UniProtKB/Swiss-Prot annotation:
Gene Ontology terms for molecular function: guanylate kinase activity
Top-level lineage group: Viruses
Domain Guanylate kinase-like: from-to ranges: 1-141
This protein's name: Guanylate kinase homolog
SUPFAM superfamilies reported in the protein's UniProt record: P-loop containing nucleoside triphosphate hydrolases (SSF52540)
Entry keyword set: Kinase, Transferase
Record carries keyword Nucleus: no
PROSITE patterns: GUANYLATE_KINASE_2
Gene source species: Vaccinia virus (strain Western Reserve)
Family as reported in the entry's similarity comment: Belongs to the guanylate kinase family.
Entries under Gene3D superfamilies matching the protein: P-loop containing nucleotide triphosphate hydrolases
Pfam family, one: Guanylate_kin
Length: 151
């Protein structure tokens, strides 16, 4: 569940489009009728405070971020199958059938596009959510150690 001020900062459509036009976002995308974007100010504030940003982006967001000054390290957590995606969505019991179908189609597109050369630095296969999480944490810890050992 998305939470204001924790996962996202919600603004109305007019405000976000105005911010996008002004160049206040590193990346932005529209997904399932919502507009998502990464604020330059938020990322710069984190960097000034020696914090590392972990972002949850779609494929277009990753592409956009790769074309910035940030030098991001990108990880794709790949489902083992589209059936797995569908099963997880059904188990959540939060979407109607047509919405589940739409999300599965989007997942298929993402899985295909994730193979684009240079887009992701690491791909984790999510055959077991706990194992995938452990792999992600290990990658993050390694990257943090590497960052602080060189800076």
């Amino acid at each position: 569940m998305e939470r204001e001020g924790v996962d996202y900062h919600y603004v109305n459509r007019e405000a976000i489009w105005k911010g996008i036009a002004a160049g206040n976002f590193l990346e932005h995308t529209e997904f399932l009728g919502n507009i998502y974007g990464t604020s330059k100010t938020a990322v710069n504030t984190a960097a000034i405070n020696n914090r590392i940003c972990v972002m949850d982006l779609n494929i277009d967001g990753v592409r956009s971020l790769k074309n910035t000054y940030l030098m991001p390290y990108s990880v794709y957590i790949r489902p083992t199958s589209l059936k797995m995606v569908e099963t997880k969505l059904r188990c959540r019991n939060t979407e109607a059938n047509d919405e589940i179908h739409r999300r599965v189609i989007l997942a298929k597109t993402d899985m295909d596009e994730a193979n684009e050369a240079g887009l992701f630095d690491t791909i984790i296969i999510e055959d077991d959510v706990n194992l995938a999480y452990s792999k992600l944490i290990q990658i993050l810890q390694d990257r943090i150690r590497m960052y602080f050992n060189t800076n």
